[in-house]
Amino acid sequence: MDPILEEFERAISGLTYTSPTIDYVSDLTGQPVSSGIDAAYWARHLRNPVRFTDATATLHEKGISTFIEIGPDGVLSGLIRETLDREQDLVAVPMLRRDRPEPHTAVTAAAHAHTHGTPVTWTTLHGQATTIDLPTYAF
């Protein structure tokens, strides 16, 4: 990575960077970030080790127990479960799985999160559905 760092930083230095508007934990530092994200940050991110375990632990310490992996397969979900296995109510699920239909795996991930207390806006996934009244049963 070293040979391209300066060129990379120059290439992205013209972009506009703003402070995060939601809580953000960096896997460059493993700590929350509120400012300082600029071209130099992303160049360091490209070069330095990923501190994924530290970032995950920081999120968990802040009360996060549901993790949804956005990526091509479930590698990091397994790492989260392995790292934070002491937490029984932990959910770590991948949004996508290799060689499986995306709609199915995405809805499965949302369902896992929902059953563990994470609010899910189902109409975003399924669109507006027509509802009908069903007969009641005496059992």
How would you label these PLM feature ranges?
Residues 1-6, 82-83:
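Short glycine/threonine-rich loop-to-helix capping motif typified by GTGT followed
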Residues 4, 35, 89-90:
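Alpha-helical context
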Residues 11-18, 23-25, 41-139:
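Flexible, low-complexity segments
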Residues 27-29:
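Reverse-transcriptase-like RNA-dependent polymerase core
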Residues 31-32, 75:
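Short, acidic Gly/Pro/Ser/Thr-rich loop/turn segments
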Residues 33-41:
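Gly-rich Lys/Arg/Thr-decorated short loops/hinges at beta-loop-alpha junctions or inter-strand turns
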